[in-house]
Amino acid sequence: MRIDVVTDTYEPDVNGVALTLGRLVGGLRMRGHLVHVMRASERNGSFNPGETAMPSLPLPMYHEVKIGLPSADRFRARWMKKRPDVVYVATESPMGASAVKAARTLEVPVVMGFHTNFHQYMKDYHFSRLETAAVNYLRKLHNRAGMTVVPTEEMRRTLEGLGFERLSVMGRGVDAVLFDPARRDASLRQSWGVWRDEVVFGVVGRLAREKNLVAALGLYTRLQREFPDCGMKMVVVGDGPMMNSLRSEFPDAVFCGMRRGEDLARHYAAMDVLLFASETETFGN
Protein backbone atom coordinates (compact mmCIF):
# COMPACT_ATOMS: atom_id res chain seq x y z
CA MET A 1 0.00 0.00 0.00
CA ARG A 2 0.96 3.62 -0.49
CA ILE A 3 0.45 5.39 2.86
CA ASP A 4 0.98 9.07 3.67
CA VAL A 5 1.40 10.03 7.33
CA VAL A 6 0.66 13.62 8.40
CA THR A 7 2.05 14.73 11.76
CA ASP A 8 3.29 17.74 13.70
CA THR A 9 5.99 15.64 15.40
CA TYR A 10 8.24 12.79 14.32
CA GLU A 11 11.66 11.35 15.04
CA PRO A 12 14.11 12.61 16.25
CA ASP A 13 11.62 14.54 18.42
CA VAL A 14 11.39 12.95 21.86
CA ASN A 15 7.76 12.43 22.86
CA GLY A 16 5.20 9.66 22.83
CA VAL A 17 3.65 10.59 19.48
CA ALA A 18 7.01 10.75 17.68
CA LEU A 19 8.10 7.47 19.27
CA THR A 20 4.87 5.69 18.34
CA LEU A 21 4.91 6.97 14.77
CA GLY A 22 8.56 6.05 14.30
CA ARG A 23 7.78 2.46 15.28
CA LEU A 24 4.61 2.39 13.17
CA VAL A 25 6.29 3.75 10.05
CA GLY A 26 9.30 1.48 10.51
CA GLY A 27 7.09 -1.58 10.91
CA LEU A 28 4.98 -0.74 7.86
CA ARG A 29 8.08 -0.21 5.72
CA MET A 30 9.53 -3.52 6.88
CA ARG A 31 6.35 -5.15 5.60
CA GLY A 32 6.82 -3.63 2.17
CA HIS A 33 4.45 -0.66 2.35
CA LEU A 34 5.44 2.67 0.78
CA VAL A 35 5.16 5.20 3.60
CA HIS A 36 5.76 8.93 3.21
CA VAL A 37 5.81 11.21 6.27
CA MET A 38 4.68 14.83 5.93
CA ARG A 39 5.87 16.52 9.10
CA ALA A 40 5.73 20.00 10.57
CA SER A 41 9.05 21.82 10.52
CA GLU A 42 10.44 25.34 10.72
CA ARG A 43 12.76 24.60 7.83
CA ASN A 44 11.96 23.84 4.19
CA GLY A 45 12.72 20.74 2.18
CA SER A 46 13.07 17.13 3.24
CA PHE A 47 14.65 15.50 6.29
CA ASN A 48 15.30 12.00 4.95
CA PRO A 49 14.07 10.06 1.94
CA GLY A 50 10.40 9.47 2.55
CA GLU A 51 9.88 12.66 4.59
CA THR A 52 8.69 16.14 3.61
CA ALA A 53 8.92 19.24 5.80
CA MET A 54 5.67 21.21 6.08
CA PRO A 55 5.19 24.83 7.24
CA SER A 56 4.80 25.32 10.99
CA LEU A 57 5.15 27.73 13.89
CA PRO A 58 6.43 27.07 17.42
CA LEU A 59 3.82 27.00 20.17
CA PRO A 60 4.18 30.37 21.97
CA MET A 61 4.25 28.93 25.49
CA TYR A 62 6.32 25.87 24.53
CA HIS A 63 8.80 26.56 21.73
CA GLU A 64 9.92 22.94 21.42
CA VAL A 65 6.43 22.06 20.13
CA LYS A 66 5.69 22.82 16.47
CA ILE A 67 2.17 23.47 15.17
CA GLY A 68 1.62 22.62 11.51
CA LEU A 69 -0.03 25.32 9.42
CA PRO A 70 -2.95 24.79 6.99
CA SER A 71 -1.56 23.15 3.85
CA ALA A 72 -4.57 21.84 1.92
CA ASP A 73 -3.21 23.02 -1.45
CA ARG A 74 0.10 21.23 -0.92
CA PHE A 75 -1.66 18.05 0.14
CA ARG A 76 -3.99 18.12 -2.87
CA ALA A 77 -1.09 18.76 -5.24
CA ARG A 78 0.86 15.81 -3.88
CA TRP A 79 -2.07 13.43 -3.73
CA MET A 80 -3.27 14.26 -7.23
CA LYS A 81 0.23 13.38 -8.47
CA LYS A 82 0.91 10.43 -6.15
CA ARG A 83 -2.44 9.23 -4.89
CA PRO A 84 -2.07 7.28 -1.62
CA ASP A 85 -4.23 4.30 -0.74
CA VAL A 86 -4.81 5.83 2.69
CA VAL A 87 -3.80 8.92 4.67
CA TYR A 88 -3.02 8.62 8.38
CA VAL A 89 -3.38 11.92 10.27
CA ALA A 90 -1.71 11.74 13.69
CA THR A 91 -2.20 15.29 15.01
CA GLU A 92 -5.19 17.62 15.09
CA SER A 93 -3.39 20.88 14.26
CA PRO A 94 -4.50 23.20 11.43
CA MET A 95 -2.20 21.13 9.20
CA GLY A 96 -3.88 17.91 10.27
CA ALA A 97 -7.35 19.37 9.75
CA SER A 98 -6.38 20.59 6.28
CA ALA A 99 -5.05 17.12 5.43
CA VAL A 100 -8.41 15.57 6.37
CA LYS A 101 -10.20 18.15 4.21
CA ALA A 102 -7.90 17.60 1.22
CA ALA A 103 -8.16 13.82 1.43
CA ARG A 104 -11.95 13.92 1.64
CA THR A 105 -12.09 16.27 -1.36
CA LEU A 106 -10.07 13.74 -3.38
CA GLU A 107 -11.99 10.79 -1.89
CA VAL A 108 -8.83 9.33 -0.38
CA PRO A 109 -9.55 7.19 2.73
CA VAL A 110 -8.50 8.91 5.97
CA VAL A 111 -7.59 7.30 9.29
CA MET A 112 -6.83 9.48 12.30
CA GLY A 113 -4.94 8.58 15.44
CA PHE A 114 -5.96 9.86 18.87
CA HIS A 115 -2.56 10.20 20.50
CA THR A 116 -3.00 13.12 22.91
CA ASN A 117 -5.71 14.35 25.28
CA PHE A 118 -5.18 17.98 24.28
CA HIS A 119 -8.51 19.01 25.76
CA GLN A 120 -7.29 17.91 29.20
CA TYR A 121 -4.25 20.17 28.88
CA MET A 122 -6.50 23.24 29.08
CA LYS A 123 -6.63 23.32 32.88
CA ASP A 124 -2.87 22.84 33.18
CA TYR A 125 -2.29 25.97 31.09
CA HIS A 126 -5.07 28.03 32.70
CA PHE A 127 -7.55 27.69 29.83
CA SER A 128 -10.18 25.57 31.62
CA ARG A 129 -13.03 27.44 29.97
CA LEU A 130 -11.83 26.21 26.58
CA GLU A 131 -11.95 22.50 27.43
CA THR A 132 -15.48 21.99 26.09
CA ALA A 133 -14.62 23.87 22.89
CA ALA A 134 -11.50 21.71 22.49
CA VAL A 135 -13.54 18.50 22.87
CA ASN A 136 -16.04 19.75 20.28
CA TYR A 137 -13.24 20.57 17.83
CA LEU A 138 -11.56 17.19 18.28
CA ARG A 139 -14.84 15.27 17.96
CA LYS A 140 -15.87 17.10 14.80
CA LEU A 141 -12.48 16.57 13.17
CA HIS A 142 -12.14 12.90 14.10
CA ASN A 143 -15.69 12.12 13.03
CA ARG A 144 -14.82 13.34 9.53
CA ALA A 145 -12.29 10.50 9.24
CA GLY A 146 -13.23 7.01 8.14
CA MET A 147 -11.76 5.65 11.38
CA THR A 148 -9.97 6.85 14.50
CA VAL A 149 -7.50 4.46 16.12
CA VAL A 150 -6.87 4.63 19.86
CA PRO A 151 -4.25 2.84 21.99
CA THR A 152 -6.48 1.12 24.56
CA GLU A 153 -10.00 -0.18 25.11
CA GLU A 154 -10.40 2.28 27.98
CA MET A 155 -9.57 5.15 25.64
CA ARG A 156 -12.11 3.84 23.13
CA ARG A 157 -14.86 3.80 25.76
CA THR A 158 -13.94 7.30 26.97
CA LEU A 159 -14.07 8.82 23.49
CA GLU A 160 -17.22 6.92 22.61
CA GLY A 161 -18.84 8.52 25.65
CA LEU A 162 -17.82 11.93 24.26
CA GLY A 163 -19.51 11.24 20.93
CA PHE A 164 -16.53 10.09 18.86
CA GLU A 165 -17.48 7.59 16.15
CA ARG A 166 -15.84 4.69 14.28
CA LEU A 167 -13.20 3.96 16.91
CA SER A 168 -10.78 1.04 16.73
CA VAL A 169 -8.04 -0.08 19.12
CA MET A 170 -4.46 -0.23 17.83
CA GLY A 171 -2.38 -1.39 20.78
CA ARG A 172 1.22 -0.67 21.70
CA GLY A 173 4.14 -2.83 22.70
CA VAL A 174 7.36 -2.63 24.72
CA ASP A 175 10.79 -3.64 23.43
CA ALA A 176 11.58 -6.26 26.06
CA VAL A 177 15.08 -6.78 24.65
CA LEU A 178 15.97 -3.11 25.11
CA PHE A 179 14.16 -2.56 28.42
CA ASP A 180 15.65 -5.46 30.36
CA PRO A 181 16.35 -5.61 34.13
CA ALA A 182 19.74 -7.10 33.23
CA ARG A 183 20.84 -3.58 32.24
CA ARG A 184 20.88 -2.54 35.91
CA ASP A 185 24.16 -0.69 36.44
CA ALA A 186 25.66 -0.26 39.92
CA SER A 187 28.09 2.39 38.67
CA LEU A 188 25.20 4.49 37.36
CA ARG A 189 23.48 4.30 40.74
CA GLN A 190 26.74 5.33 42.41
CA SER A 191 26.96 8.36 40.11
CA TRP A 192 23.59 9.42 41.52
CA GLY A 193 25.04 9.24 45.04
CA VAL A 194 23.05 6.11 45.90
CA TRP A 195 24.23 3.79 48.66
CA ARG A 196 23.87 0.06 48.11
CA ASP A 197 20.58 -0.43 49.99
CA GLU A 198 18.92 2.87 49.13
CA VAL A 199 15.67 2.87 47.17
CA VAL A 200 15.71 4.87 43.93
CA PHE A 201 12.44 6.50 42.92
CA GLY A 202 12.28 7.63 39.31
CA VAL A 203 10.28 9.96 37.08
CA VAL A 204 10.72 9.70 33.31
CA GLY A 205 9.17 11.96 30.68
CA ARG A 206 8.68 15.47 29.40
CA LEU A 207 9.02 18.01 32.19
CA ALA A 208 5.82 19.93 31.55
CA ARG A 209 2.75 20.93 33.56
CA GLU A 210 0.42 18.32 32.07
CA LYS A 211 2.63 15.52 33.46
CA ASN A 212 1.66 16.35 37.08
CA LEU A 213 5.30 16.19 38.14
CA VAL A 214 4.90 18.24 41.31
CA ALA A 215 2.57 15.53 42.63
CA ALA A 216 5.09 12.78 41.86
CA LEU A 217 8.06 14.58 43.40
CA GLY A 218 5.89 15.79 46.26
CA LEU A 219 5.06 12.18 47.11
CA TYR A 220 8.77 11.41 47.32
CA THR A 221 9.30 14.39 49.66
CA ARG A 222 6.45 13.16 51.85
CA LEU A 223 7.97 9.67 52.03
CA GLN A 224 11.28 11.20 53.08
CA ARG A 225 9.56 12.98 55.97
CA GLU A 226 7.53 9.96 57.08
CA PHE A 227 10.40 7.47 56.83
CA PRO A 228 13.55 9.46 57.68
CA ASP A 229 15.57 6.33 58.47
CA CYS A 230 14.95 4.73 55.08
CA GLY A 231 17.56 5.65 52.49
CA MET A 232 16.03 6.88 49.26
CA LYS A 233 16.89 8.96 46.23
CA MET A 234 14.80 10.73 43.57
CA VAL A 235 15.97 10.60 39.94
CA VAL A 236 14.34 12.62 37.16
CA VAL A 237 14.98 11.65 33.53
CA GLY A 238 13.78 14.05 30.84
CA ASP A 239 13.74 17.69 29.83
CA GLY A 240 11.18 20.39 29.26
CA PRO A 241 9.94 23.83 30.30
CA MET A 242 9.63 22.91 33.99
CA MET A 243 13.26 21.83 34.40
CA ASN A 244 14.47 24.96 36.19
CA SER A 245 11.46 25.31 38.49
CA LEU A 246 11.64 21.63 39.49
CA ARG A 247 15.36 21.93 40.22
CA SER A 248 14.61 24.86 42.53
CA GLU A 249 11.68 23.20 44.28
CA PHE A 250 13.33 19.78 44.68
CA PRO A 251 17.09 20.44 45.08
CA ASP A 252 17.77 16.95 46.48
CA ALA A 253 16.61 15.22 43.30
CA VAL A 254 19.07 14.09 40.63
CA PHE A 255 18.19 15.52 37.20
CA CYS A 256 19.67 13.45 34.37
CA GLY A 257 18.30 15.31 31.35
CA MET A 258 17.04 13.63 28.20
CA ARG A 259 18.14 10.05 27.53
CA ARG A 260 17.62 7.76 24.56
CA GLY A 261 17.94 4.13 23.53
CA GLU A 262 20.22 1.90 25.59
CA ASP A 263 21.18 4.81 27.84
CA LEU A 264 17.49 5.33 28.71
CA ALA A 265 17.09 1.60 29.30
CA ARG A 266 20.02 1.67 31.75
CA HIS A 267 18.37 4.49 33.67
CA TYR A 268 15.09 2.61 33.92
CA ALA A 269 16.84 -0.57 35.07
CA ALA A 270 18.76 1.32 37.76
CA MET A 271 15.52 2.52 39.40
CA ASP A 272 13.53 0.63 42.00
CA VAL A 273 10.19 2.47 41.87
CA LEU A 274 8.77 4.42 38.91
CA LEU A 275 6.42 7.29 39.79
CA PHE A 276 4.00 8.23 37.00
CA ALA A 277 1.45 10.83 38.06
CA SER A 278 0.20 12.17 34.72
CA GLU A 279 -3.59 12.24 34.41
CA THR A 280 -3.68 13.21 30.72
CA GLU A 281 -2.14 10.18 29.01
CA THR A 282 -3.72 8.17 26.22
CA PHE A 283 -0.88 5.66 26.53
CA GLY A 284 2.23 6.36 28.60
CA ASN A 285 5.16 5.52 26.33
Regions found by a protein language model. Give the residues of each.
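A structural motif in glycosyltransferase catalytic domains
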Residues: 21, 28, 201, 216-220, ...
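Donor nucleotide-sugar binding/catalytic pocket of nucleotide-sugar-dependent glycosyltransferases
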Residues: 39, 53, 131, 135-185, ...
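A conserved, positively charged/aromatic
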Residues: 104, 114, 118-147
